[in-house]
Amino acid sequence: MTSLDQIIDDFAFLDEWEDRYRYVIELGKNLPEMPEVSRTSENKVQGCASQVWLVTHATGDAEDPLLTFEGESDAHIVRGLVAIVLAIFSGKRASEITRIDALDIFGKIGLIEHLSSQRANGLRSMIRRIKSEAEGRLPA
């Protein structure tokens, strides 16, 4: 999977929005395919116009576990957005995930203002889902 730093660098290098959209689609194509068995209603992200599934894996410290995520979408651009979301959050501790401002990152790479309202809402739904998963893994 492409690192967040690499994604940010690549976006800075691409001047045209058509090239940036192609890059988002490429990121999605490079995302490991989620097994069909994981594409359940329980893993489906509500609030996305396209179908999006997220699976959370927790390891390590029960008080502040390390979370990794798998993601999938049936739409090319959204699948690329899933890849960026996973680059932002996957492999981090639950406490760190709750503090990350992913929308700010999408703003810095200039992508948020170029998304349709449906895609932006779906992106927010993915972020809320991941943050909710992280908050649910932390002690009350």
Curated annotation (Swiss-Prot):
Q: Family membership, please give it.
A: Belongs to the SufE family.
Instruction: Note the InterPro entries from the entry.
Output: Fe-S_metab-assoc_dom
A UniProt-annotated Pfam family: SufE
The protein's name in its UniProt record: Uncharacterized SufE-like protein R01000
